[in-house]
Amino acid sequence: MMKKRASHHLVICTLIDTLRFRLSSRKAISMNAFNKLVKHSKKISNFNHLSSIVGWDQAAVMPSGGAEARSQAMAELSVHIHGLMTQPQLADWFAEAESETLNIEQQATLREMKRQWQQATVLPEALVEAQSLAGSKCEHAWRSQRKNNDWAGFEKNWAEVVKLSQEEAQIRAEATGKTPYDAMLELYEPGTTTEQLNRVFSDVKTWLPSLIDVVIEKQSSESFIAPKGHYPAESQKALGLDVMKLLQFDFNHGRLDESVHPFCGGVPSDVRITTRYNESEFVQSLMGIVHETGHARYEQGLPKHLAGTPAGEARSMGIHESQSLFFEMQVGRSPAFIAHLAELAGKHFSAMNDPVFRVENIQKLYTRVQKDFIRVDADELTYPAHVILRFEIERDLMNGKIKHTDVPELWDQKMQAYLGLSTKGNDQNGCMQDIHWTDGSFGYFPSYTLGAMYAAQFMAAMKKTVDVDGAIRRGDLSPIFAWLSENIWSKGSLFSTDELVKQATGERLNPEYFKNHLKSRYLD
């Protein structure tokens, strides 16, 4: 997950910046309106820099006793940023800037600044503060409540988060003429609608369940050796760091830590990624690091000359997830990359002769399909079912068709329908398992499967000009990263998602690439 603090109001604020404006000093200012807005953007970006690092600290290293004071501090900061974001003079600056002569890059920067400003100005300051407080409280308590399967305790805090999120969704819907859920989607996937997602996901539901069953049956006759023993966290971290080096992560501008829920946070110049270790196996944490490194490389590769402005940020969360899933699924699970993982793992665990670390065995471990409860541990094939379930619930929750108290039962029903599993009485492995909803990140989940689809499409396009398998076998992935940099990373948010994908691949999102990728990997 890319940790865009789902206090989206804060994230949204992230993009524009402040200028203490006094009418009496107008004549002393020589900058045109566009440059004022850019300066404004960079100043608020600095505040959000601090907010992002503090958010990482809260998730990774803050002692439990610091939660209440931290919540107050974060709420104060979010209110401050929101106030800067909604200063009255910004409307005049936008009006003036639109009449100025701007180049294509400047026009895109202005467009994105205005879009983010419009999203921020619809929310009253009191709501922003209330959401920050409720989200911090709910998220912190969730960390222990999930462990204890304490739905009753979680529900008391979550009720307020949902109420405030529904209020936000309604305000945004009235301002934009969208449905409440579409208005929330716009925060993560600009231009994407529920209608589009319903169409894409409905198609997936026609072929995914049967494909899952066919692959599980096919793999039932295949033998593999599951990791058994003790894999020290220190050794797992050292292994992860070596893999990050292979993926050319810039350690001068980032680091790896631990947290309850893996994420990528920080800022492009200081990217913080986390994972979690289970000393009885190493498979999940290792590929989790590969996933978060994909997020991090995207952040580190964003256009530096646009830093501090919306145009210099990631295009959408779907594109962000496409990069993490490109690393994890397209590259990370390829036979050539698995060969590197097998060698490195055998070295770090001093078990080069252990059959667990044979290339073919590691390959089977990373392409094993099974129906499971946990999204973050799900395999590539069953993962979309987890996403579709969440999409359908949060869509109906934000549109007021269901109540938050309905969620556990609905979750159980959908898990049984899509994966044949029941979560009745097991909410810690059901509706309480994700961090997203604890602070109101409704609308984020579709980004994961959209990202998987974009990633498959990017790989298909890349292979037309790049010897991908050869680069991975050689252990020099530079040609792969050069393609991503040229076609995705360096373009930030200069183009719409549709246009970005079309420029890179020759067409807009085409889910057939994802379907073909899955069939090729798991049936051929």
Placement of each model-derived feature along the sequence:
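A well-structured
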Residues: S30-P190, K519-L523
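Active-site recognition of the HExxH zinc-binding catalytic motif
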Residues: Q284-Q300, E321-L325
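Post-HExxH zinc-binding segment in Zn-dependent metallohydrolases
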Residues: E313-N353
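C-terminal, non-catalytic "cap/extension" segments appended to globular domains
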Residues: A33, S52-G55, G65, A69, ...
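Polybasic, lysine-rich low-complexity intrinsically disordered segments
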Residues: K3-K4
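Contiguous, non-catalytic segments that form substrate-binding/exosite surfaces or channel walls
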Residues: Q131-F282
